[in-house]
Amino acid sequence: MAVQQVKKSRSKRDMRRSHDSLTGPTLSTDKSTGELHLRHHVSPNGFYKGKKVVDTKSED
């Protein structure tokens, strides 16, 4: 079994762990509706970069 030669200090341990935190998804505001969506993804209404790229069912 591996055993450390010198004990790591709390500071060194915590500095190593400083990059382990998770970040939330990056969101953008849709130009046409003002709705939030994931960046580089088509919004739920079928728009991408201000252009209609996917036909969606109408709610009528």
UniProtKB/Swiss-Prot annotation:
Belongs to the bacterial ribosomal protein bL32 family. Residues 7-16 have a biased composition (Basic residues). GO terms for biological process: translation. Residues 1-60 are annotated as: Disordered. The keyword Magnesium does not apply. One of its GO terms (cellular component) is large ribosomal subunit. It comes from the Bacteria. InterPro entries: Ribosomal_bL32, Ribosomal_bL32_bact, Ribosomal_zn-bd. One of its GO terms (molecular function) is structural constituent of ribosome. This is Large ribosomal subunit protein bL32. It comes from Francisella philomiragia subsp. philomiragia (strain ATCC 25017 / CCUG 19701 / FSC 153 / O#319-036). HAMAP family: Ribosomal_bL32 (MF_00340). The keyword Ribonucleoprotein applies. Keywords: Ribonucleoprotein, Ribosomal protein.
